[in-house]
Regions:
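Recognition helices and adjacent regulatory flanks at domain boundaries
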Residues: 1-13, 17, 21-25, 47, ...
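N-terminal helix-turn-helix DNA-binding core of bacterial DNA-binding proteins
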Residues: 13-56
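Basic, amphipathic "hinge/linker" alpha-helix immediately C-terminal to the N-terminal HTH DNA-binding motif
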Residues: 23, 76-99
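Short, charged/polar surface micro-motifs in flexible loops or helix N-caps
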Residues: 36-38, 63, 90-91
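Residues within the helices of the helix-turn-helix
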Residues: 42, 62, 82
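Canonical helix-turn-helix DNA-binding module
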Residues: 47-75, 79
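Amphipathic alpha-helical dimerization/coiled-coil segments
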Residues: 95-131
Length: 131
């Protein structure tokens, strides 16, 4: 576990810093996919309907690794395969992903995937804490 803080050289508000570090679509979708059980480059590339380009996937994985949000282990059956996982720092982003999804389901009319439908059904039956 990396408890050392991420260095950020500019003076800014916390919201601006977090958006600068994590606010791009692909980083958040990789984090979402890790929460959903995906763990390999191939799974991120082929099993996400958003269709991330290979160069962007490589870049974002490196960025998330450098920030200590994810890490990897080599697969036991094939040492060439990296199995990515969320670190404690990455797991701390769960409420962010959760609230983005909850906000979208509440305020945006869109055609959503089976994963989103299942997740929505689950949270409809989960008591919400007052913020």
């Amino acid at each position: 576990m990396n408890s050392e803080k991420i260095s950020y050289p500019k003076q800014a508000c916390a919201c601006a810093v977090s958006l600068d570090l994590l606010g791009d679509k692909w980083s958040l979708l990789i984090i979402r996919d890790l929460f959903r059980g995906k763990s390999t480059y191939s799974e991120f590339l082929k099993q996400s309907q958003e269709g991330i380009a290979t160069n962007i996937l490589v870049d974002r994985l490196k960025k998330l690794l450098a920030m200590g949000i994810i890490d990897f282990r080599r697969a036991s059956h094939d040492k060439k395969i990296k199995k990515y996982f969320l670190t404690d720092r990455g797991i701390d982003l769960y409420p962010v992903i959760y609230e983005f999804q909850r906000w979208t389901l509440k305020h945006v009319d869109f055609d959503y995937t089976d994963n989103t439908k299942n997740w929505n059904d689950l949270i409809q039956n989960t008591p919400q804490e007052e913020v």
